[in-house]
Design a protein with these regions (language model features):
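Metal-cofactor-binding active-site regions of metalloenzymes
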Residues: 1-188, 197-205, 209-214, 220-237, ...
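Conserved hydrophobic beta-strand within the GNAT/NAT acetyltransferase core sheet
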Residues: 190-192
């Protein structure tokens, strides 16, 4: 029997797609809500993003001049966090991983205060969903300092993973070793943004150097058979964000998106939103775009969905 998700893709039925359980495992918390939801809450118009944002800098500029303009400050950050959980409810996201920077946690106060606040949203909107908080650090940070302070954030046991974002090849992978070694003490999943702009070789070296279990983006691994075999053999999960890649110009289009090559070479991939508020494509739409473009079959997309849920 065909499941509701496969039916939804083949019939172009949004309600069926919304009702099927899904995951979102690469989600920047302060940009995790829908534009429509936020506009309604603030009672303002927020314009649609252009089809192409010029790289990471273009993305930040658009965010500053369109979102921050109407939604800045502490209370509005909380509102955007709330919106991410509201979206999990609307889209039946039964496994949600969101990342938070230490500066964002610090704004709330203690880690315990942060946990209470986030769990209140979790309980209100999607109590049955598995939620995991991920701690993300900027690639330009002072790693020694961050490693020394990691205990403060990790000892509560609330954060399940560690990540580096905000631009690749800013420091050599070895520079992050103190932080990733410290993360092992708390059994944190080790992840990193790599292979979005960086090379296939970068992806492999990051995994080997830091002992990553997952890679955020990782699409440029598709240019190397060796790297893809390495990722497949070592069961490294690659959390792909199609609309993000296309809009930022890191993938040409949906039809030729590198996810196709990764899947065909046995790499374990998941499909995610990255920054929903910016890229304006909610999780069911990410699957639908890839299906409509002929990138992957409904069955392949369903397998990816199941993997994200932890069923495979």
């Amino acid at each position: 029997v065909e499941n509701i998700f496969v039916e939804g893709l083949k019939e172009n039925n949004i309600n069926k797609l919304l009702s099927a359980p899904k995951s979102d495992l690469h989600n920047h918390s302060t940009k995790g809500c829908r534009r429509e939801w936020l506009a309604q809450k603030l009672n303002v118009d927020i314009s649609k993003p252009p089809q192409h944002l010029d790289g990471l800098e273009g993305m930040q500029n658009w965010f500053r001049s369109n979102i921050k303009l109407v939604c800045d400050g502490y209370e509005n950050m909380l509102l955007r966090w709330e919106g991410a959980f509201a979206e999990a409810k609307r889209n039946n996201i039964t496994r949600l991983v969101m990342n938070f920077g230490t500066a964002e946690v610090d704004q709330v106060g203690s880690v315990e205060a942060f946990r209470k606040l986030i769990e209140e949203f979790h309980k209100t909107y999607c109590p049955d969903s598995i939620f995991e908080a991920e701690l993300t650090y900027p690639s330009f940070g002072n790693v020694e300092e961050e490693a020394a302070e990691l205990d403060k954030y990790a000892e509560e046991g609330y954060f399940k993973a560690i990540d580096i974002c905000a631009g690749e090849n800013v420091q050599p992978f070895e520079a992050f070793l103190p932080l990733y070694k410290k993360a092992e003490k708390y059994h944190l999943n080790k992840k990193m943004h790599v292979g979005e702009t960086g090379s296939a070789e970068d992806v492999r070296r990051a995994v080997e150097t830091l002992g990553l279990s997952e890679v955020h983006h990782g699409i440029n691994a598709s240019t190397s058979k060796e790297t893809m075999r390495f990722l497949a053999d070592n069961h490294i999960q690659v959390n792909v964000c199609p609309s993000s890649n296309v809009m930022l110009g890191f993938a040409k289009d949906y039809k030729s998106h590198p996810i196709k090559t990764l899947v065909e070479n046995g790499v374990r991939v998941t499909i995610n939103t990255d920054d929903l508020l910016i890229f304006d494509s909610s999780i069911e739409n990410e699957y639908l775009k890839l299906y409509k473009s002929g990138t992957l079959s409904a069955e392949q997309l369903d397998e990816i969905r199941q993997r994200g849920l932890g069923n495979l």
